[in-house]
Design a protein with these regions (language model features):
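Zinc-dependent deaminase
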Residues: 1-20, 84, 88-162
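Short, basic and Ser/Thr-rich N-terminal targeting/leader segments
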Residues: 21-25, 71
Length: 162
């Protein structure tokens, strides 16, 4: 599979996350163009702050390949990795990261900071912007829907005392 097709699989995972009420982020770990593992965010449904798509995909790939060193693998993810996920990428030795949309709030591949430029023992190649418009559209639609749901929900107001 090409990077474009692999990112398509990540976008499908992101759509699954959105359908569950999760922030729509999807990731795939691939080796030689073949998907080894795919995942999407499950932080809300699993009530676990660590359940980002990237970490879940890395975990599944490690289990499938029988080791923690994924130096022959690439990670394609719909949103620029956060600090936690960037740490997982470094520790698992992913050789290349391709992401779609930039994350101006928590992105660690250059948007907020670049963890991969720091003197760690591993530095993956990073490519950005692949199918970014599609990834951004999923995120924007999700957060618009979330804002609309919150606006429609009555808010508690304290009783007025005379």
């Amino acid at each position: 599979m090409t990077d474009y097709e692999l990112m398509g699989a990540a976008l499908e995972e992101a759509a699954r996350a959105a359908a569950l009420g999760e922030v729509p982020v999807g990731a795939v770990v691939a080796r030689n163009g073949e998907i080894i593992a795919a995942a999407h965010n499950t932080r809300e449904t699993e009530k676990n702050a660590l359940h980002h798509a990237e970490l879940l995909a890395i975990d599944a790939a490690c289990k499938k390949l029988g080791g923690w060193r994924l130096w022959q693998c690439e990670l394609l993810v719909t949103l620029e990795p956060c600090p936690m996920c960037s740490g997982g990428i470094i520790n698992s030795r992913i050789r290349r990261v391709v992401y779609g949309a930039a994350d101006t709030k928590a992105g660690c591949c250059g948007s907020v900071t670049d963890l991969f430029a720091l003197p760690f023992n591993h530095h993956p190649v990073v490519e950005s912007g692949l199918r970014a418009e599609e990834a951004q559209a999923l995120l924007q639609a999700f957060f618009l829907r979330l804002r609309e749901q919150r606006a429609a929900k009555p808010r508690w107001k304290p009783p007025v005392t005379p």
